[in-house]
């Protein structure tokens, strides 16, 4: 059949360089292939004319009895040289232009690893730059040889014989699609499990269902957090509550503390008026001091409740981080408000010091309890 087809071509005109003929592979050698095209002698396809990418041996591309479309690149009396890659390239450019125009995604097999990226055979040489292989950094591409990748054409220039492909672009499209799907499945108020992906100074990014949401530092714990890395680590599983979802900007706000019982939920059974407790001074303000008596639970010691003597400014006798004893005066769970007193705790516990040394005698000036408390607070501050 091949001979008949080519006989018809040769009957109508003499074979010329540039003609396209059909041939059957009669012999596959290491560096060339012999093909019967109905000419008086078998044509030869040099290994360099088999493909548009580097190949080690001819058998990597063709096999015995395979039917090929070939272009005549040299024709002399007993010398017929043919090219498979020239025909492949002509067809390839037409197909590649269609794929480039439509943004079509298609599979390719990596033929070679070169400096700067990957080489594929598309009928013409295609190149995937290292920066366009994956969304993440790849140090060694050795394992990519022979691998099949989904790609799209990002640059096409026939005059320069330039075909640039991207696998990264396909991965990003898939990730974006999954992200939109994940976002659409999340609703404000949902409590879901996530994985800590990244930690920053302002919070933590947590992956929930394939999409990252931000847990602001203020939403990590009911207790004050200076650095997210103090309480969280990458890869940690956490329960989060969805605070808000913005499908347009693809932003998700999450809260770890909102997914946990609040420190005030069981406060009624733990703290009651009259209790004497140890606490830590967390904040000093002009009207008093906020003292933490349980993790995440602070009460106010009004400036009038710091000592029996007049205290103009709380920082005169107290400092941040200082440990103090306080008496619970009032507990208002609904308002999350607790009133505390340092001076009453001193009075009730009698400061645990022997104050007999301060008792006045006939020859000494009198002392007031306010002086004693003020002196003790100053000692604690030191």
From Swiss-Prot:
Which terms are listed as keywords in the entry? Phosphoprotein, Repeat, Ribonucleoprotein, Ribosomal protein, RNA-binding
Name the GO terms of the biological process aspect. translation
Q: Which GO terms describe its molecular function?
A: mRNA binding; structural constituent of ribosome
One GO cellular component term noted in the UniProt record for this chain = cytosolic small ribosomal subunit
Q: Which domain of life is it from?
A: Bacteria
Which residues are modified to Phosphoserine? 244
Which CDD domains does the annotation name? S1_RPS1_repeat_ec1_hs1, S1_RPS1_repeat_ec2_hs2, S1_RPS1_repeat_ec3
Per the record, the similarity remark reads:
Belongs to the bacterial ribosomal protein bS1 family.
Q: Indicate what this protein is called per its UniProt record.
A: Small ribosomal subunit protein bS1 homolog
Q: List the source organism.
A: Bacillus cereus (strain ATCC 10987 / NRS 248)
Taxonomic lineage from the root: Bacteria, Bacillati, Bacillota, Bacilli, Bacillales
